[in-house]
């Protein structure tokens, strides 16, 4: 309950107008039914119809947290299955249409947090300039997660100042493309 409240406070601070919490218990996502969780994410992809999906890498991202690793695994599979006519047929028979988001990115970084589980961060394939002010706003939003307070000092120390870029790894795309460093996650995306 407290983690949900922290998440909602963080979203409110950022001005997010729609957020959903799927109700899985903190630190227990690895015990959830794979097809159920992926199905819930497929449902949201089909309803919201995003062009780009962002998630953690399957190593758990910067923190190496098991829930983050599972979120990455579930989101990766949902990215693949949301566009298929042979997955979650009950959603399609209820009137939803399949939807193939065009790109899937994993959040990544060029540093590691000390005293965390070892991770294998994916190669940076996109550097998005966000500016110091936006990055600082992101950090302040993170600070609404009071239960994560022990990480704050380590994160600040690891950042070594206020970065101005966010880093991502292009994990999948619907259209073949040459490997290159992108500056915009919507580069090459075709509008519906």
Where are these regions (language model features)?
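Metal-dependent de-N-acetylase/amidase catalytic core
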Residues: 31-192
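Active-site rim/loop-helix segments in enzyme catalytic domains that contact anionic ligands
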Residues: 1-48, 84
């Amino acid at each position: 309950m407290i983690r949900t409240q922290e998440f909602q406070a963080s979203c409110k601070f950022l001005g997010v107008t729609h957020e959903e919490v799927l109700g899985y218990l903190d630190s227990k996502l690895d015990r959830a039914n794979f097809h159920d969780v992926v199905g819930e994410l497929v449902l949201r992809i089909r309803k919201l119809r995003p062009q780009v999906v962002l998630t953690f890498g399957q190593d758990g991202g910067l923190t190496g947290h098991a829930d983050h690793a599972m979120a990455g695994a579930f989101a990766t599979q949902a990215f693949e299955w949301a566009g298929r006519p042979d997955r979650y047929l009950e959603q399609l028979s209820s009137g939803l249409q399949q939807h193939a988001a065009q790109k899937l990115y994993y959040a990544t970084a060029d540093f590691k947090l000390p005293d965390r589980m070892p991770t294998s961060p994916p190669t940076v394939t996109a550097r998005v300039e966000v500016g110091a002010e936006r990055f600082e706003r992101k950090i302040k939003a993170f600070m609404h997660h009071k239960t994560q307070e022990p990480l704050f000092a380590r994160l600040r120390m690891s950042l070594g100042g206020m970065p101005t870029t966010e880093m991502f790894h292009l994990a999948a795309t619907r259209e073949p493309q040459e490997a290159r460093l992108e500056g915009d996650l919507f580069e090459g995306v075709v509008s519906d």
